[in-house]
Amino acid sequence: MGQKRQRDQKGPGSFAKKRKKSAKPSDATAEDSDWDGIVGMNELNWKEVALPDRLEDAGGFFGLEEIEGVDIIRSEGNGEIKFKKKEPEETNTQSDDEWEGFGDDDQAVSQEESKETQDEPNESDKKAKVKESKNAKKEKKKNAKDARKEQKEKAVESKEDKGIKSGLSFAALQEEEDDGADVSAWESLGLSPEILAGISKMKFTTPTSVQKACIPPILDGRDVIGKASTGSGKTLAFGIPILEYYLEKLRSKTQKDSEKTETTPIALVLSPTRELAHQLAKHIGEVVSHAPGVNARIALLTGGLSLQKQQRVLTNADIVIGTPGRVWEVLSSGHGLIRKMQAIKFLVIDEADRLLSEGHFKEAHEILAALDRVVDGEFPDESSDESDDELDPKSGRQTLVFSATFHRDLQQKLAGKGKWTGGDIMSQKESMEYLLQKLNFREEKPRFIDVNPVSQMAENLKEGIVECAAMEKDLFLYTLLLYHPKHRTLVFTNSISAVRRLTQLLQTLQLPALALHSSMAQKARLRSVERFSSPSSDPSSILVATDVAARGLDIKGIDFVVHYHAPRTADAYVHRSGRTARAGASGKSVIICSPDEMVGVVRLAAKVHANMANRKKVPLESLELDRRVVSRVKQRVTLAARIVDSNIAKEKVSSEDNWLRTAAEDLGVDYDSEEFDNAAARGRGRGRGRQERERKAGSTSKGELAGMRAELKQLLSQRVNVGVSERYLTSGRVDIEALLRGEGNNSFLGQVDPLDF
């Protein structure tokens, strides 16, 4: 009873059995040393990692090596790492479609596999079925889409066939043959037949003055600095010689029957804005598409688009056009791209005064320094002492510089209290010295071509000024737009917030307004420009923009430019006003000036029109608006401003509330909006009046907003009555027949005298 049961002693065999059981799942790691393909780390075929051309803050990550096609095996016991080469996949010599019949071994193997997989579902088959079903759905959608597209095309073709008369078929062919224009005026420039054919198809009968003056010296290999007024055709002045060099290179390549090598760009064109870069690519691309035998590939490098895609496009590009920021990002992050770009034959800097101005476009200076660096293999840091000795003293490329303003004095702020210099236009000597310090020209003295030395403004541009109170700018802007109902108008402001507010205000007043500023996404910016410039768009469309649209944009049909804010610098005014009166057309430019902006506007007139002092023409004419019109439309603008200010204030309060709520959650504290409001109400100081107005505007109820919208809608449904008796229509100077036909200005009911410049 008291004896304890003795436990059987376990011999070493039992421990061995346990070890065997535990070792079963790790047989692969225990016997990995016996596997074939395991090699030492130093025996692998390591490859050096290719670093970008310019890598900042590398932190010692130089000399990195990589290996492909190797499996890493880690032992469970001691954690030792071993490397095993992947076995190459055996290529199946027999085709999958070949059938060899059934065999006994195959049946036995298939039976065993079916028994093993009977209990467990095959996940790969399920995935394959799901994938097949998705592909089938995609194919069905694609087929349906193609069918609808074919039906539409057939319908369009049938409509076109119905509209064509049988007797006009040969006349249509003759019109296509006679499509080109007479380009005999271009023959003196020494252009090739291919380029002349493209110019003929584009209907450019005569070259502009800047094209006549600049194309021959560029074809002769000279460095050129071109100064011409806005809208004078500077793009083709450098685009045509680049395409001529492309054709010459193409002919020499075909004559020598040289082997095909990787494409090297022949030209780099830098522009300050994305919109201007897109426009340059469009204009040069039109010449390429119309000229027979010219197949130059253009790479457009601007922000807002895929960086990897632009790097791929750059590998086979002949002409590279872009903004400095994205061009430098692509070049510095790529492999061998800087070395490739050093072989370019043309460096074009459009709007050079903006790109080379102090404190702006740091990337432009980086690009210029990288293009001139001649170090074998690597590009050392710019801070090194030997960097000055490594710059190429004379570049082998042509440098072409174009702008409408080169005077550094024009970039001085007009409203500043600092020393104000005279308004004399920059002389040729001063411009040359300024650019020679910034750029590495091939020649000691590049050719300076000033087509219009007397005035920087277009000849057919009419300039005016409207004086008003600071709080009445919205009212006078709306009145000016009513005076020009069928004019495509461009409104410039000095801030992004003003663009957003004015766009909403004009849209509330039922005017077709679009916005353009630098904070917009790239696709939205392109969409706004496309809608504004489309021939099918409303002829009275309005584009409210910052100075991002001031340079280079060539939009046909802009008749009217309004400066809602006086420009900060004189060169900004020159480029803003240059959006109209382009290529010999007429245009108007009006500044809405408040009393605090008057000093800057007076300085502006003195700077821009310095050489017109002895002429009878007044540079900026004072325009008087009809006070009857201003008083009648004041109620409209007041209601629209209250609606817009209320919406903006509510959006601002909502965004601030969301930010404070998120910050409180991150800190782990309770958020009480009333407590924050009470604390803000106790504060004093600058900005309290504005905050109080925003709070009052944001507290407007939905019912009040609906009432204001209804009242505004009723006012907008009627014309502005300027002294017409609604009971006795035949009295006064009203032309009833013209009103019934819809002639004249449909915004007014009565006779309104147009603005006289």
From Swiss-Prot:
GO CC aspect terms: nucleolus
Q: Where is the composition biased (Basic and acidic residues)?
A: 1-10, 71-89, 112-136, 144-161
Motif DEAD box mapped to chain:
350-353
Q: Which GO terms describe its molecular function?
A: ATP binding; ATP hydrolysis activity; RNA binding; RNA helicase activity
Taxonomically, the superkingdom here is: Eukaryota
Q: Where is this region: Disordered?
A: 1-38, 66-161, 678-704
State the compartments where it is located. Answer: Nucleus, Nucleolus
InterPro entries noted in UniProt: DEAD/DEAH_box_helicase_dom (IPR011545), Helicase_ATP-bd (IPR014001), Helicase_C-like (IPR001650), P-loop_NTPase (IPR027417), RNA-helicase_DEAD-box_CS (IPR000629), RNA_helicase_DEAD_Q_motif (IPR014014)
Name a Pfam family for this protein: Helicase_C
Residue ranges constituting the Helicase C-terminal domain according to the UniProt record: 460-626
Xref: SMART domains: DEXDc, HELICc
Spell out the protein name for this chain.
Answer: ATP-dependent RNA helicase mak5
Upper taxonomic classification of the species? Eukaryota, Fungi, Dikarya, Ascomycota, Pezizomycotina
